[in-house]
Each structure stands twice: as C-alpha cells, then as structure tokens.
Design a protein with these regions (language model features):
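Phosphate/nucleotide-binding beta-alpha loop and adjacent structural elements of enzyme active sites
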Residues: 1-269
C-alpha cells in the first residue's frame, strides 16, 4: 500500500504514519524497539498495520506493565525487559509519579520526596543481550530522559534507520528538542517529521511533540519532485485564488483598523 492510501487508515498526524512512509519508500526495518512501551500496544499496532514479520523489543521501567509485555512474549515470541534505560548499567533512584504513565528517570523532572530504586541498563547492553538485528527503528517515550537513553545507545544508533521521540518544549531546566536534534545530527540523522503537537491546557502554548528522525544513509527525500505536475497546477491555482481573496479583503481590513484607531483616540475602545 502506498503512503497516500495508508492515510485513509492512518491520518497524516498519527505516530505511525511517518514509519509507514519510510517503509513504503524503501527504508529497511528489521526490529522495532519501544523504550517506554507501557502495555506494548503501540508495537502491536506497528506489527498489525505495517509488517507482522518485524521483530520487537519492548522495554519499560515499571513492573505494572510486565503482565502485558509477558503475554506478548508468550504469544508472539517477542522479548521484553523491565528496566529503566539510561547511559549506565546499574541502578538509579526515581521519583514516584502520580500516574505510571508519567514515570521519569530524569533528575530535572522534579523531586517529590517519595523515591524508589530501579535497575538501569544502557540500550546498547539490552540490544546485545537480546541479540537485536538491525536496522532498528526506535520509539522513545521516556518523559524527559531522552538524552540519557540516547547517550547509552551509541552502538545501537549505528544500526538504526529512524527514531520516533516524544520531544519536550520547556521553559524549565532540562534537555530541549534542540539538544536531541544536535545529538542525532552529529550521528548522521536528519529531522524527518513532526507529529502530534500538544499544547498546555493553561495557556495553549506548545509543550511537546513527537519528532521523527531518519538516518541520512536511508533518506529518500529528494529522489522525487516536491509535487507532481498535477499537484503543482492545483497549488498554483489555489495560491492565485487565495491572493485575489486576500486583496479583496484589504479595503474592509483598512476600514476596520481606522475605526478601531478612532475609537482608541476618542476613548470609546
């Protein structure tokens, strides 16, 4: 199925659509690695909708997800690990979250005073232990701990074709999207897409989105023109029509502005 046809099943802004586009354009994926897998449903969606032959590695830090991930392993033979993922092998202490979805191993995410210890593994160590075969596509949903995971995945990234990363936009301390971008750009990845923009409920400002990266050696963009001839003709017609519409609105907008300025001067506005 081609990328346009897939959009009938998965709209353009879904988390799975960029992966579909990559695969449909010849990007090879052997293993899907989900760091922050929760109950494993996203990886199941990838297998069900994209390629049932993909290998999986589900990873989550919390025991509460073990029964779901163990069931996937028992029925499909796809391994899982219950461990935090970071830049060292050992343990770390984390703050207990208000909901299991929001567990973060990142120290900058704030202290609650209620902490507990978790095992911690580098992604490189886990992939070697499981025997992961590349090229890999990696999903990271780790609540602010993205840089730690990436720093412990140097070897894995060398055999990775793409990544889907929940990316923060923060005013508070901690890594930003630009830090993630710079780290991956230095390792020959390019930004491929951005989906699922999320906005703060209090003031509607952007606080996170999912960034998609592609390994430069697999980047297919540029092989085809920006648009087909038919699409280009449609765009030209649309922008011509839009300009005429905007020009027609100029007198009304000027009149409205003059009226509002007059009201301000007289104290009525």
């Amino acid at each position: 199925m081609d990328p346009v046809a897939h959009q009938n099943v998965f709209p353009r802004d879904t988390l799975i659509t960029p992966l579909i586009m990559m695969i449909n354009n010849g990007v090879p994926v052997s293993t899907f690695i989900d760091v922050g897998a929760a109950d494993g449903t996203f990886a199941l969606t990838v297998l069900d909708a994209v390629n049932p032959s993909l290998r999986l590695l589900n990873i989550d830090a919390q025991e509460t997800y073990a029964p779901s991930l163990a069931r996937i392993e028992a029925l499909l033979g796809e391994p899982y690990r219950i461990t935090a993922v970071g830049e060292h092998d050992g343990t770390l202490r984390v703050n207990r979250p208000k909901h299991e979805y929001w567990l973060s191993t990142a120290s900058h995410m704030g202290a609650t005073g209620d902490t507990f210890e978790l095992p911690c593994r580098k992604l490189d160590s886990l992939c070697a232990e499981v025997g992961v075969e590349g090229p890999c596509f990696i999903k990271l949903d780790v609540e602010g701990a993205e840089m730690g995971v990436l720093k412990g995945a140097e070897e894995t990234l060398r055999d990775t074709c793409g990544l889907l990363i929940e990316s923060p936009v923060r005013a508070a301390p901690g890594p930003q999207f630009l830090d993630i971008y710079a780290f991956l750009a230095a390792r020959d990845f390019s930004l491929f897409d951005m989906v699922r923009l999320s906005h703060r409920g209090s003031d509607a400002t952007l606080y996170q989105f999912y960034a998609v990266f592609i390994a430069n050696r697999f980047d297919f963009r540029g092989r085809a023109p920006l648009r087909t001839k038919a699409q280009q003709a449609e765009v030209l017609a649309a922008v011509t029509e839009r300009r005429e519409h905007l020009r027609a609105e100029i007198p009304q907008m000027i009149a409205s502005i003059k009226l509002k300025r007059a009201m301000v001067r007289t104290g009525d506005g």
